[in-house]
Amino acid sequence: MTMSNLHPGFILIAVGLIALFVPKSLRRPVLAAVPLLGLGAVLTLAPGTNATLPFINGITLHYLHVDALSWIFALIFCMMAAIGGIYACHNSNRMEAFCSMTYAGSALGVTLAQDWLTLIFFSELMAATSLFLIWCKKTPASRQAGYRYLLVHMFGGNLLLAGIFLKVSAGDYLVMPLAQGPWDTAFWLICLGISINAAVVPLHAWLVDAYPEGTVTGSVFLSSFTTKVAVYCLIRIFAGTDFLIWFGVLMALYGACYAIMENDMRRLLSYHIVSQVGFMVAGVGLGTAMALNGATAHAFSHILYKSCLLYTSPSPRA
């Protein structure tokens, strides 16, 4: 495997594993420097790159597929992992370092996957590692929020898994756009599973409940990946699905109204995530080239400015 087709997600997962076992004196340089290799790997990926791996029953896993859409999301995810790694250098919690990097690597795994099996594997790994990021705060509130987060994402993950099972059973192994139909059971199961991750109203309560309960580092990683990976999946699979316009508008208005009424800075920013993701979802629903480019650009910039806001709001009250 050359640098030109090295999976950046694998690099970040390796960083997490290293951080889990090395002493703190070595963990800091690992978190600060090694994620930059992932960023370098993204920069060397050429459009059209497609790495595969043989699987059971003649199935081929397309675990590294690069086009313009996957590349831009992979770029911002690696940038965020590198920035977050530098910020996390002060942290003595090795489990948080492991989960944050594995979480980011899993997000890249979903982004660069071209087949359903790879997508669901990394999606579930994202859910597991993000759960432990919430629990890393080790407070009663974070434990309770984590259990609720677990229940919601188990439900959403099972919906997504059931939809993917139907697609794979029908011989459809590759991730393809579904907006043009048929709007069958698999369509609705996959759409609902991804919508939960995108915090589409009324499936959004887990975000406002869980994100404020994480550590500062954990909250920044949480805000950067789960909903944005879901937006990527919506663009990839459901672009032009009309009803997403109305859900996006509802999210934008609902999140903004509740953010105005909040006096807890973390909860305010969590509602603001719902609102801003609503604009992205509405763009996906419109489905035009300009709307999809706008949703992608908004996701890119939102990760950057939201992380800055969360880095500067460690206190529980504004």
Q: Which residues fall in each region the model found?
A:
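Transmembrane helix-loop-helix hairpins at membrane boundaries of multipass inner-membrane proteins
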Residues: 1-98, 172-173, 177
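Bulky hydrophobic/aromatic packing residues
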Residues: 12-15, 63, 72, 104, ...
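Hydrophobic transmembrane alpha-helices and their helix-loop junctions in integral membrane proteins
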Residues: 83-94, 101-119, 128-313
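A short, hydrophobic C-terminal helix/tail in secreted or cell-surface proteins
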Residues: 314-318
